[in-house]
Amino acid sequence: MLKLFSAFRKNKIWDFNGGIHPPEMKTQSNGTPLRQVPLAQRFVIPLKQHIGAEGELCVSVGDKVLRGQPLTRGRGKMLPVHAPTSGTVTAIAPHSTAHPSALAELSVIIDADGEDCWIPRDGWADYRSRRREELIERIHQFGVAGLGGAGFPTGVKLQGGGDKIETLIINAAECEPYITADDRLMQDCAAQVVEGIRILAHILQPREILIGIEDNKPQAISMLRAVLADSHDISMRVIPTKYPSGGAKQLTYILTGKQVPHGGRSSDIGVLMQNVGTAYAVKRAVIDGEPITERVVTLTGEAIARPGNVWARLGTPVRHLLNDAGFCPSADQMVIMGGPLMGFTLPWLDVPVVKITNCLLAPSANELGEPQEEQSCIRCSACADACPADLLPQQLYWFSKGQQHDKATTHNIADCIECGACAWVCPSNIPLVQYFRQEKAEIAAIRQEEKRAAEAKARFEARQARLEREKAARLERHKSAAVQPAAKDKDAIAAALARVKEKQAQATQPIVIKAGERPDNSAIIAAREARKAQARAKQAELQQTNDAATVTDPRKTAVEAAIARAKARKLEQQQANAEPEQQVDPRKAAVEAAIARAKARKLEQQQANAEPEQQVDPRKAAVEAAIARAKARKLEQQQANAEPEEPVDPRKAAVEAAIARAKARKLEQQQANAEPEEPVDPRKAAVEAAITRAKARKLEQQQANAEPEEQVDPRKAAVAAAIARAKARKLEQQQANAEPEEQVDPRKAAVAAAIARVQAKKAVQQKVVNED
């Protein structure tokens, strides 16, 4: 029955899996009271001493500052920092900070003036009359953050808790070896700590308030019990010493039996936890009106002559604190910020004290032993047995070493609290915590990159959607403009329609013929004449364009002319020395002669008016002339053996000559008034003219030496000649009075004229013969 009653007691505690019991080593520093350290000459205050973004600077180089004066502005989750003493801002530049890699962060450097003057302080002793929001804002603006090691802004944490917090836990376990800052603070300032707890309770209004403290702090337990003797709203739970019972999840389970869900927060189960040092800082911010400018720091280790706990101003160089405590470094001396399990080694001693600095450990060479070489994992599972978060450190080790980020995430590497228990028990001396920290950093970087990529994709898709909307709107405007033409377009369309209707009305209007009157066709005749004139003008322009475009090559013309002359000479020689066996057709000869003369005249006119485009190469012209002469000689030899064609009827020749003369006169008149339709190639004209002249000479010789085989009827010849002359006169009269509607081909006209002249001459000759 007694055991059953004990099980239902209110102060029941639970135990978590894993954990270790390393040597505590706390007696080196917890036996002496808190003391002040002399001010340093220079303070380095990093702008970021908490989780989250740094604040906005509100001072500049050369400014005079007082203790407690804000150096940055805190907006949102940004936490401000304050001047630790009065002095002058000498620089604002990057400086190495309290970090395992000693990364340089933007810092404000202040040279102290030694006066240590405060800003005007306005404390709220009657904080119970203040609203919850006012208290949270004051805590935030006074720079209060979690002093247990996380550095999370306290005001943000209180704001996030809201009205769902049922249990407020004050973490006083301080389980890591060597560290006694909270122990000494509770011994020397227990009343102030409890007052800070009451301010937090006033803000959160929880149903219960629990203080968790390990049983290895008897003096602190005594002081708290004395202060809480008359208080019934705050319960203190003394728990067994076990590392890491001071972890947030572990202490929550020990005191409440509730487990924080994976990936969640303690506020999800109605629990909010604050550190003892944080409660003390809340009291000083609200009641005393003092921003956080200092904190308790444990100085311990066998390399320090006077170990203990001191009030260290934020921004004080570590070297200054160690020298004040009698630091005696060895050849290979190391200094650890934090405890031996969760702390990190400082690369040098010029880094400043920040809000999360709770211990400076300077061990001797024999105190921690010689560092041993890392060996291969033997899969003994000792790390898994010691893990307080129920993880598999050996598997996480392999995943971290193999860059298998997905598997490490699946095995809940984010739940690792980096307590170092696994590395403490590892027989292979594997620094597991270092591997886990590196893996967490890489996963965080990957997620940050994925987040930026997702944001960039969202911006791109939004831009594409905007462009599509603009394009659709533009197309819609174009469609509207096409459907509804503008006023000017409407006027132009109406004017065009009116002109079309007017033309149609004029075209369909009938011509009325009245009795005794003649119809007036003058308008129609004038329109016809205008169209003819327009057509002739267009044809003249086209002819001028063609004449300008036609270019005669003088070299080819010269060659062809030479060939024609050679052929003509050869033909003359043949006619002079040879007796024709047959009569030559005089009609064909006359026609060809007339054609040749017409072409020759036209060629002379074109050559007189045309400018050659390019100079003739005399060498090429000489070569071509020689070739032409050779061809002419060969032609003479070939024609020496040729026979003439059949005899010609003189009657038909006379008629054709008369017709040719009439047509020639008509052609001359047309050429005087009209422009030729097409340009004649002068080269071909010259060749044909030469050939025609040769043939004409040959024909004359044949006619002079030949006797006609048949007698021509003189009456018929006279009648034909008279008819030809009458037709010629009639044709001349028609050409003199009429305007030609179409252009006449000059070559055909020349041929017809030549034929007419030959026929006329022949008819006259026949008439003379008949009269004789």
Curated annotation (Swiss-Prot):
Record region (Disordered): 602-684, 696-717, 727-746
Coiled-coil annotated residue ranges, if any: none
Membrane topology qualifier: Peripheral membrane protein
Domain 4Fe-4S ferredoxin-type, chain residue ranges per copy: 369-397, 407-436
Residue ranges, compositional bias (Low complexity): 605-615
GO cellular component terms, A-Z: plasma membrane
Taxonomic superkingdom: Bacteria
Chain residues that bind [4Fe-4S] cluster 1: C377, C380, C383, C426
Single Gene Ontology MF annotation: 4 iron, 4 sulfur cluster binding
Physiological role: Part of a membrane-bound complex that couples electron transfer with translocation of ions across the membrane. Required to maintain the reduced state of SoxR.
Protein name per Swiss-Prot or TrEMBL: Ion-translocating oxidoreductase complex subunit C
Species this chain originates from: Escherichia coli O157:H7 (strain EC4115 / EHEC)
UniProt lineage: Bacteria, Pseudomonadati, Pseudomonadota, Gammaproteobacteria, Enterobacterales
